[in-house]
Design a protein with these regions (language model features):
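N-terminal secretory targeting modules
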Residues: 1-36, 43, 47-57, 88
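A short beta-strand-loop structural module common to alpha/beta enzyme folds
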Residues: 58-71
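Alpha-helical cap/lid subdomain in secreted, periplasmic
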Residues: 54-56, 76-128
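Charge-dense, low-complexity intrinsically disordered segments
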Residues: 10, 68, 103, 107
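Conserved beta-strand elements of the Class I
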Residues: 36-38, 62, 90
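Soluble or luminal CAZymes and related metallo-dependent hydrolases
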Residues: 15-18, 70-74, 108-112
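Solvent-exposed loop/turn segments at secondary-structure junctions
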Residues: 41-44, 68-71, 96-100
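Short, well-ordered amphipathic alpha-helices
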Residues: 40, 47, 114-118
Length: 128
């Protein structure tokens, strides 16, 4: 692996871990049973709370997106990014970063997505 790629991967891993540490800290104060957005960069950068404020809507939506995330990373960190919040509704957008991996990327993505959905159904059966 090229040295610059290795360094970028290390930097991405540190950034991700910092976000997860911040999310875990914020989860302590989160209200259970609210709406959650989780996934990769499209979710992380989606300005849902700004839209809600602009429309005068009094809703709580938690955002636990992490730019660059793949489905295997979400599977590993579902506790901090989903289950600690005990959401009643979840919007998931993840998988685009999985598609640039070698081999059967689409097949692997579908398999991983099914695992994510199965774990949510098991742990949060009332969640939509």
């Amino acid at each position: 692996m090229d040295e610059s790629v290795r360094l970028l991967n290390q930097m991405q891993a540190r950034i991700c871990e910092n976000k997860l540490r911040r999310y875990r800290g914020m989860n302590v104060y989160a209200k259970k049973g609210e709406t959650l957005m989780v996934g990769s960069s499209l979710m992380e950068h989606f300005l849902i709370n700004e839209f809600l404020l602009a429309e005068g809507l009094d809703k709580v939506v938690y955002n636990r997106g992490v730019a660059g995330w793949r489905t295997d990373e979400l599977l590993k960190d579902m506790e901090a990014c989903i289950f600690e919040l005990e959401p009643s509704k979840i919007f998931i957008n993840i998988g685009s970063n999985d598609l640039d991996r070698p081999g059967d990327a689409l097949g692997r993505l579908i398999k991983q997505y099914r695992k994510i959905l199965r774990k949510i159904k098991e742990r949060l059966p009332g969640c939509l």
